[in-house]
Every structure is written in C-alpha cells, then in structure tokens.
From Swiss-Prot:
NCBIfam families: hrcA
Organism ancestry: Bacteria, Bacillati, Mycoplasmatota, Mycoplasmoidales, Metamycoplasmataceae
Keyword hit for Nucleotide-binding: no
Function: Negative regulator of class I heat shock genes (grpE-dnaK-dnaJ and groELS operons). Prevents heat-shock induction of these operons.
InterPro entries tied to this protein: GAF-like_dom_sf, HrcA, HrcA_C, WH-like_DNA-bd_sf, WH_DNA-bd_sf, WHTH_transcript_rep_HrcA_IDD
Alphabetized GO MF terms: DNA binding
Keywords of this entry: Repressor, Stress response, Transcription, Transcription regulation
Protein name, as recorded: Heat-inducible transcription repressor HrcA
Membrane-spanning parts: none
Single biological process term from Gene Ontology: negative regulation of DNA-templated transcription
C-alpha cells in the first residue's frame, strides 16, 4: 500500500485530470497522462481506498472515478501554485504605474486576471478601516452642489445635495457646514463619521439657522458608506457547466451584495487569510483577505466545482505579492 504522501499525490492527479477533461478517470488514463511508473492494479487499489475514504466517487456509467465534495476541497487546499508568466508580466506593468490609488490599481489587476485566466473575481474593501482624508464642495448652481470625499485608500465618493425643496437652506449654509466638517472630521474613520457629525450639533447651531436639515442631509446621504463589491467576468460563471439556473441566480445575487469571506464558514488552517468552500450546489468559492496599511481588501474567485483552483490560487497569491510592497506605508 502506498504511503499517505504518495496516495495524496495520486488523488491530486486524479482530480486535476477530471477538472481538465470532465470525464471519469480510469487507472489507465491516469498512468498514461502523468507517465506513472506503477501498475494499473496499484492505481485501482489506491482509487478504491480513496473512494472508501470519501474523496472519490464511482459513476454508474463508467469504471472511472470522479471527485466528491471532500475530494474537491482537498484539491483546492493542497494543490500547488504555478507561475503564469503572461499574467505576472501584465500585473508588473499595472503595478509599475505611479500615482494610481490602490482601488484603481486593483481594478486594473482584476480585469487582467479575468481576461488572461478567465475567472470570475469579486473585489471589495472594508470601509470600516478607512478614514476621511478630504471633503470638498463643488457648486453646480444656486440650488445644488456636489460633495467630493476622499478616503485614506484613495477612494473618491461623489455625493450630490439638492436644495430645491428646501427654501430655508442656502448654499452659503452648506459652505459653512463643509468648513466645519473640514476642521472637525478629517482623519475620522468612515464608520464613525455619522456619529461624529451628530456631535457637532452645538457648533453648527451657532452658524446655521436650519442646521438640523443640513445635518440630516449629510448623515443620510453624504456620510453614508457601504462595502461595495466589484464583479469581474460574470459571464465566465454563467457559461460554466453543471450549475443550475436557480443556484446561479442565487450566487450572482450573493456575490454582488455580500462579503464572500463572510459567506464561507470553513477555513484553511495554514493560512488564516484564505478561505475555501466547495458546495453541493456545484459552486466553489475562494476568498483572500489582504491587509494593507489601515484597510482590508477582499479578493475572491467564484466558479463551479470544476474551476481551475490552481490558477485561481496562483493569481490571488501573485496579486498579493504585488499589492503589499507597493502600498505598504514605508513605500508611500
């Protein structure tokens, strides 16, 4: 009987071949594909053991085996990364650009990964760790203005205030409010902006007659920040085989409106910043947290259970290797 390490190696090869071909894997196919110096009988015995342990399943129409959910999970967690020279070259080009914020850079990188590897990616930022760095007023006319806010990660938010229905409020009042917010709210964490703004009531009341109307407008609109997902290559998952329409609709809604990280209960013990989930609904999720300065970036890959786990993990690892050196504090 093979040692566990050898058996694990055989299991990885079986699943790798199945992911590539989509067909049940036989002992002869495995030996031929990977030029294994073992007999078919030995491979069949190993396959039988792996089936008994719940990593493989036998189909009714073939003598070959296919991965079980446990098998896919094992492959996703233990398969080794590989170098994609084209992707590495493209990311190097993107990250060499100066003066781009981390969000703009991440956007370009995610697009490159989608185009080169063909994965469905989701990126998001945890705004709870960001702070307000700038707030500016741009007047559009006598009754409306755009408020521009810039966060510590370079994220820019444009919020419009319309005073058409508030005849007792003038743009001069908004100017005064902006000046006070600049003095009191810069370097405040985004999650605390609304609370801190409310605490300015006594000061605002000294300078603005109808300060409560302005304050509620800022709290309800301008100072409202949410974690926003950006989805790349949505068509890739739509085209994948084996995902029924109901589950596809559910997963598309989830990835657009929820944290993939929080959706995954399981965790790879060796790396507390990486989570992998292989589901019975033929959906697989890989999510990585990358900590840069005072913010958290979430990079996730979504696909069917036959997704290219090796390329997905390799792309995430490569992306992290570029992000941290460029955007760490010592390099800013």
């Amino acid at each position: 009987m093979y040692m566990k390490e050898k058996r694990d190696e055989i299991l990885l090869k079986i699943i790798d071949l199945y992911i590539k071909s989509g067909q049940p894997v036989s002992s002869k196919q495995l030996i031929s594909e990977y030029k294994l110096a073992v007999s078919s009988a030995t491979i069949r015995n190993i396959m039988a053991d792996l089936e008994n342990e719940g990593f493989l399943e036998k189909t009714h129409t073939s003598s070959g085996r296919i991965p079980s959910i446990s098998g896919y999970k094992f492959f996703a967690e233990h398969s080794k990364s590989k170098t994609n020279e084209l992707l590495e070259s493209k990311l190097k080009e993107i990250f060499s650009k100066r003066y781009l914020s981390i969000d703009v850079t991440l956007d370009e990188a995610a697009k490159a990964i989608n185009e080169i590897i063909g994965l469905t990616l989701v990126t998001s930022s945890n705004v709870n760790t960001e702070v307000l760095k700038s707030i500016q007023l741009i007047e559009l006319n006598n009754y409306s203005a755009t408020i521009i806010l810039v966060t510590s990660t370079g994220q820019v938010a444009n919020k419009t205030i319309d005073l058409t229905n508030f005849q007792d409020i003038k743009l001069e009042d908004v100017r005064i409010a902006i000046r006070l917010f600049k003095e009191r709210l810069i370097n405040t964490s985004l999650i605390n902006l609304r609370e801190k703004a409310l605490a300015l009531k006594p000061i605002l009341s000294k300078y603005i007659k109808n300060y409560e109307t302005i304050l509620q407008s800022f709290i309800g609109n301008v100072f409202e920040f949410e974690n926003k997902n950006h989805v790349y290559g949505k068509s890739n998952i739509i085209k994948q085989e084996g995902i029924d329409r109901l589950h596809l609709t559910q997963i598309l809604d989830l990835i657009e409106n929820n944290s993939i990280w929080n959706m995954i209960e399981s965790k790879v013990e060796e790396d507390e910043t990486l989570k992998i989930d292989v589901r019975n609904s033929n959906i697989s999720l890989i999510s990585k947290k990358i900590f840069v300065n005072n913010t958290t970036k979430e990079i996730s890959v979504i696909g069917s259970n036959r997704m290219d786990y090796i390329s997905a993990k390799s792309a995430i690892a490569l992306l992290e290797s570029f992000i941290k050196p460029k955007f760490s504090k010592k390099n800013n």
